[in-house]
Every structure is written in C-alpha cells, then in structure tokens.
Amino acid sequence: MAKDYPRSRRIAEQLRRELAEVIRDDVDDPRVGSVTISEVQVSRDLAHATVYVTVLGAEAAEAQAGIDILNKAHGFLRSQVARRIRAKRTPSLRFLHDTAFDRGARLSALIDEVAPPPADDEPSKE
C-alpha cells in the first residue's frame, strides 16, 4: 500500500474544492448533470490526480457520458484549477465514476428485502 503524505492530502483536498467550483460555475454542458466530487487521489509526485465523481439522479449510461465529457475537458479544467491554486505544477486529471454510493444503495435494498421495516399500524407492546 502506498504511503499517504500530508502534502498530497492537502493538494487533493484543495483540488476537490476547486474542481467542484469550476465544474459548477464554468462547465455549461447539460450532459454533465449534477456532479459531486467524492474523492481526489493524488500521486506521490503530484503529477497525476484521479478524481472520483458521482452523477446524481442519472442512469449508468448517462453518468458515464457525463464522466466522458469531464475527461475530454480535462485540459480546460486543469488550466482553470491551476489559476486558482498555488502550486508549482497542477496534476493531470482523470475522472472515474465512484461506485461506492451505488453499492451502498444496492446493499440497503438487499437488507430491506431480507428484513423489511416494521409497519406503522402494528400495535405497540406496552
């Protein structure tokens, strides 16, 4: 497992904040949809950043289309972020779909199937 360095954590958090603002304010493509950046992982040499995103309220194909658009716009996004952060170098960006939310929703649905929540109209035990 790779070591986690405080500088790379700081840069990752700063990238996450700035990318969220840039995508919200400067990306006008409606195919991107409502994007949430859940995590940014930066390489030790700070040359590459993997950005995990979720597209809210979108089917898998629509979400992937939005992520593909972000990957095509990575140069624009990188230049906009470079203007906002103080770093010698801005990492190259790669956007990936974060499946953690989808897995959590699927597990929650499976749990509800096995043990459905109690009905409200059952008499309480007193």
From Swiss-Prot:
Keywords assigned: Cytoplasm, Ribosome biogenesis
Compartmental location: Cytoplasm
Keyword presence, Phosphoprotein: no
Pfam families per UniProt: RBFA (PF02033)
Any one biological process term the GO annotation gives: maturation of SSU-rRNA
GO cellular component, one term: cytosol
Annotated function: One of several proteins that assist in the late maturation steps of the functional core of the 30S ribosomal subunit. Associates with free 30S ribosomal subunits (but not with 30S subunits that are part of 70S ribosomes or polysomes). Required for efficient processing of 16S rRNA. May interact with the 5'-terminal helix region of 16S rRNA.
Known partners and oligomeric status: Monomer. Binds 30S ribosomal subunits, but not 50S ribosomal subunits or 70S ribosomes.
Name this polypeptide is given: Ribosome-binding factor A
Source organism per UniProt: Halorhodospira halophila (strain DSM 244 / SL1)
Gene name of this polypeptide: rbfA
